[in-house]
A protein has these predicted regions:
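Intrinsic-disorder/low-complexity regions
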Residues: 3, 25-27, 147-149, 165, ...
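A well-ordered secondary-structure block
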Residues: 38-56, 158-234
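Gram-positive Sec-dependent secretion signals
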Residues: 1-40
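Generic detector of short, well-ordered, non-transmembrane alpha-helical segments enriched
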Residues: 35, 110, 128, 221-222
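Short, well-ordered surface patches within globular domains
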Residues: 44-172, 230
Length: 234
C-alpha cells in the first residue's frame, strides 16, 4: 500500500486501532462480532464524494471541489465527543477494556463517514484487535515508529502470519497514525479523553487529504496531498 504522507506518531495500540488493523479481519467470519457503536461522528462536507475519492486513487488528481471539501471537513469537524475521562493510562500497556473502548470509538468515526457515502458499517472483531496488538508490539519491540521512512513491513508481515493472514502480500493491512509529543503529554501516559481526541484528529487527517499542519494552516491547499487513506477507510 503506497503511502505518500506520514502521520504523527509514536506507535501505540491506539495508533494501530486507528487504521487498517481494525479492518484487516473485517470479513473474517471466524472472529467474534460485537455491536457497532455509533456515538462519535465526522461530517463529510458537500463536494466530498465517493467518485472524487475513487478518481484521486486512480489518477492522483484531486478536484478543486474535493480539496475545498477537505479543508471544510478539517475546520468544521471539531466535536470529538471524547468525554471527560481524565484517568491516566499507559498507551503501551492498555487494558483489554481500554483497547475495546478505543476500537469502538474509532469505528464510530469511520462508520459515520462510510454511512454518509452509502457504505455498510464495519463491526468490531476480537481478531482485528489481536492483530492490532501484534502489529503495535512489533513496532514497539523493534524501536520503530511513523517517523521512519515507511511502514515497518517485516513486523507487519510477522504479525499477519501470527494472525493467520497472508504474510506474503506486503503492506496491505496498515493505515498508521499516532500520538504527538507535547508539553502536556511527553511520556507514554495519556488520559483516555486525550487519546480519543488524537484519534479523532488522525481519522480526520486520513479522510481529508492527509492534512499535515497546524490549525492556522487548514486553508492552505498544499497541505492536502493524498486521499489514499480515505480510499482505504471508505
Amino acid at each position: 500500500m503506497r503511502k505518500n504522507v506520514k502521520l504523527l506518531s509514536t506507535i501505540s495500540i491506539a495508533a494501530a486501532l486507528a487504521g487498517g488493523a481494525v479492518t484487516a479481519l473485517n470479513n473474517d467470519s471466524s472472529t467474534s462480532t460485537f455491536s457497532t457503536v455509533e456515538a462519535a461522528s465526522i461530517t463529510l462536507p458537500s463536494g466530498y464524494t465517493k467518485s472524487a475519492i475513487i478518481k484521486w486513487n486512480q489518477t492522483g488528481k484531486a478536484s478543486k471541489a474535493l480539496i475545498n471539501a477537505s479543508k471544510k471537513g478539517m475546520k468544521e469537524n471539531i466535536n470529538s465527543e471524547a468525554g471527560n475521562d481524565n484517568s491516566l493510562v499507559n498507551v503501551t500497556k492498555l487494558t483489554n477494556s481500554q483497547k475495546v473502548e478505543l476500537s469502538k470509538y474509532t469505528l464510530s468515526l469511520i462508520n459515520s463517514a462510510r454511512n454518509q457515502l452509502g457504505k455498510q458499517s464495519w463491526t468490531y472483531k476480537t481478531g482485528a484487535l489481536h492483530f492490532a496488538d501484534r502489529v503495535a508490539n512489533q513496532y514497539y519491540d523493534h524501536d520503530r515508529s511513523c517517523w521512519d521512512a515507511d511502514h515497518y513491513v517485516p513486523g507487519i508481515e510477522r504479525a499477519a502470519k501470527a494472525s493467520g493472514l497472508n504474510s506474503r502480500v506486503g503492506q496491505v493491512y496498515e493505515d498508521e497514525a499516532g500520538l504527538p509529543i507535547s508539553s502536556e503529554f511527553h511520556t507514554n501516559m495519556r488520559t483516555m479523553s486525550a487519546l480519543k481526541n488524537q484519534i479523532y484528529f488522525n481519522v480526520k487527517q486520513m479522510l481529508f487529504g492527509g492534512f499535515s499542519g497546524s490549525d492556522s494552516q487548514m486553508n492552505d491547499s498544499s497541505r492536502y496531498t493524498e486521499w489514499e487513506h480515505a480510499g482505504d477507510l471508505l
